[in-house]
Amino acid sequence: MRFTKKGNKIDIDKAEREIVEAIDLGVNYFDTAYIYPGNEVALGEILSRNNCRHKINIATKLPQYLIKSKKGIDKYFNEQLSRLKTTYIDYYLMHMLTDIAAWEKLKNLGIEEWIKEKKEKGEIRNIGFSFHGNTEMFLKILNAYDWDFCQIQYNYMDENSQAGKIGLKAAYDKGIPVIIMEPLRGGKLVDLLPHKAKEIISKSPRGYSAAEWSFRWLYNQKEVSCVLSGMNSIEMLRENVKIASSTQIDSFTEEDYKTIEEIKSEINANIKVGCTGCGYCMPCPMGVDIPATFRCYNEMYTENKKSGRKEYFQLTAFKKDINDASRCIGCGKCEKHCPQHIKIREKLKEARGELQTPWIKLQLKALRILKPWQ
């Protein structure tokens, strides 16, 4: 849940009312992470106060990007147990894996043996990973270990980006449950919809809200195991539970799919690059993640500039092999394979100019020097 703040601290009393209500309504999966300020502590305190730890599943994440030794793994894990006031974690994730190199680093630190030990002791019940990257990397990580579950960003606008539909189906085919994050793209598929998209929703005979269209599109798919939603009000909580409990797999009609496509069309009307994310331009000999760069560039204009730049930094900064757009040398190899005939070199230059602000450039430079992944 997304806890409401009172000043600089979480409003623990309000959060408690929301969590207790959620449990009463049947919600049993609570997602948090080490780097969410105050979140683990608040959740642990509330569960302890109400003696309801046994009723729910806690999912939290190892900040793998901060770890440089096996001792570091134990340090963060033990601190999380203390924060959450529990002796075990139901669903433990390697947080924000972006490429196979991040997993290989953890393997070299002995993570596989560590996981085996924690599972045998009952301190971890399920092991997984949360992913931010492209489909190719998702498939590599998916097949690199015997995962119990995984977590991906997925919504009707990200169907063909990040892990995407291909990644979702691949996990399902392997029998790996998939947890969905960002079903509303951080609320943007509700709050930042173009006027014409809102009109399409309001005129639909279904009578669904913008959020309901997004959730129903997800719940319609058999490959989706669980959908996360950042809720900070009782009203939002009740609405989301109602939608989840009233949606069936394969319940979408042709008209429903048509409505989603019309909404997407209006959102895409403001895109800067007609990239479909097919990946035929890859691999770039210099390592530039071309589809991801264009996706973030488009996001600046279909949503807002801050979110596009934030995602760009997230996707480029924490990789062992730096892959930001500034590495393009203009060789043109990518353009020979683009089915959309995009002038990739020209568009990468445009994207770099808007995505790489002086502040982002400074942070990327610092990360290259510090190399926290080593």
Question: Where do the protein language model's features map onto the residues?
Answer:
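Glycine/proline-rich, positively charged
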Residues: 2-10, 20, 24, 67-184, ...
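A short, structured active-site edge motif that brings together acidic residues
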Residues: 54-66, 92-95
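Short hydrophobic/aromatic-enriched beta-strand-loop microsegments
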Residues: 54-57, 146-153, 248-254
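Short beta->alpha linker loops
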Residues: 34, 38, 98, 132-133, ...
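Structured C-terminal cap/extension of enzyme domains
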Residues: 21-23, 27-28, 47, 166-374
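Alpha-helix-loop-beta-strand connector modules within alpha/beta enzyme cores
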Residues: 41-60, 112-122, 173
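Short catalytic-loop micro-motif centered on adjacent basic/acidic residues
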Residues: 28-34, 125-129, 151-152, 226-228, ...
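N-terminal binding-site loop/beta-alpha segment at the start of enzyme catalytic domains
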Residues: 1-56
